[in-house]
Design a protein with these regions (language model features):
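Serine-dependent carboxylesterase/thioesterase catalytic core
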Residues: 76-87, 93-210, 216, 223
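Short, proline-enriched alpha-helix->beta-strand connector loops that line the catalytic pocket
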Residues: 72-74, 207-213, 235-240
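Catalytic histidine-centered segment of alpha/beta-hydrolase-like enzymes
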Residues: 115-116, 247-256
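Acidic catalytic loop of the alpha/beta-hydrolase fold
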Residues: 219-225, 249-250
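Post-His helix in hydrolase/transferase enzymes
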Residues: 253-267
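Short alpha-helix in the alpha/beta-hydrolase fold that links the catalytic acid
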Residues: 92, 225-232
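Flexible, membrane-associating and regulatory peripheral segments of lipid-active enzymes
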Residues: 1-76, 90-91, 99, 268, ...
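Short glycine-rich catalytic loops that host catalytic nucleophiles or stabilize transition states
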Residues: 106-110, 241-248
């Protein structure tokens, strides 16, 4: 590679990173404005209307229903991140609806959460409630940041793979985050350090776990440090790790490419949990 070509590639890469940081700042501002909208919600799932009528659906939506009604109607539960609420998923929810997924629900675990295993028990109860209410034995869960870790604990450690077909995580500190060392006195944050007992517990054997996992991790994530710690690397789990370039922590639930990839992954349902090809 010539020096000139290398310089051009570096310049393009830096431009993409700068653009990603600017978008991250913009989404951070927008989310602060939307945040109050998510305060008025119970912790139990908010059930979305299930639509079976194809009239008024886009060709893309009709195509999904035509090729897989069960995939289109499998419930999806959205779980937000730390110090947040379901407003972070406003764009993601709209994007998934446009792609034909019609049964979306939201779960808020509360600002006072201090213990991930206990939060996982409560989330599990909500998932099982949603499963019973919709008649689907297994649903999908999309978790942002801490929400993905709570959901993973339920799926991997509490038998939640019996109720969750696919867990998608966005910027989730599966291997902890070095940033957590800055606040060691906070019980919840302490669980997020890379060498915490919780992170070590999640690294223990998980043979027989039926769920599939799709983990997105970015290179400019300012909360998961280093960004590769959002990868889910476990020999017993069925995982697809997806790197996203130039997308920040808050931008992940609002990124069109990520929403498209999630939709592609959820289009196909396999009883054994093996993923479709995004």
């Amino acid at each position: 590679m010539t020096p000139a070509r290398l310089s051009r590639l570096v310049a393009v890469d830096l431009l993409q990173v700068a653009s990603g940081l600017a978008i991250e700042a913009a989404w951070g501002t927008a989310h602060l404005m939307m945040y109050p909208l998510g305060l008025f919600s119970a912790s139990s799932p908010v059930l979305a209307e299930r639509r079976h009528d194809r009239r008024g659906l886009s060709p893309e939506q009709r195509g999904l229903l035509h090729h897989g009604v069960e995939a289109a109607e499998t419930p999806i539960l959205l779980v937000h991140g730390i110090i947040d609420n379901h407003a972070i998923f406003t764009v993601m929810e709209h994007a998934l609806r446009r792609r034909g997924f019609q049964t979306l629900s939201r779960y808020d675990y509360g600002l006072l959460t201090q213990n991930i295993p206990r939060a996982a028990v409560r989330l599990g109860a909500a998932i099982e409630e949603l499963s019973a209410a919709t008649g689907y034995a297994r649903i999908h869960v999309i978790g942002h940041s801490l929400g993905g870790l709570i959901a993973r604990y339920y799926v991997q450690r509490l038998g939640g793979d019996q109720h969750v077909h696919t867990l998608v995580t966005l910027g989730t500190p599966h291997q902890g985050t070095q940033l957590a060392r800055a606040a060691p006195l906070l019980p919840l944050v302490r669980q997020l350090t890379p060498d915490s007992p919780l992170i070590q517990e999640l690294a223990e054997p998980a043979q027989g776990c039926r769920a599939r996992f799709v983990a997105f991790y970015g290179d400019i994530d300012h909360l998961v440090v280093p960004g590769r710690n959002a990868r889910l690397d476990h020999p017993d789990l069925n995982v697809q790790n997806i790197a996203v370039h130039g997308v920040g922590h808050l931008s992940m639930p609002n990124n069109g490419r990520i929403a498209f990839t999630i939709a592609q992954a959820l289009r196909e349902l396999h009883p054994d949990g093996t993923p479709g090809t995004p």
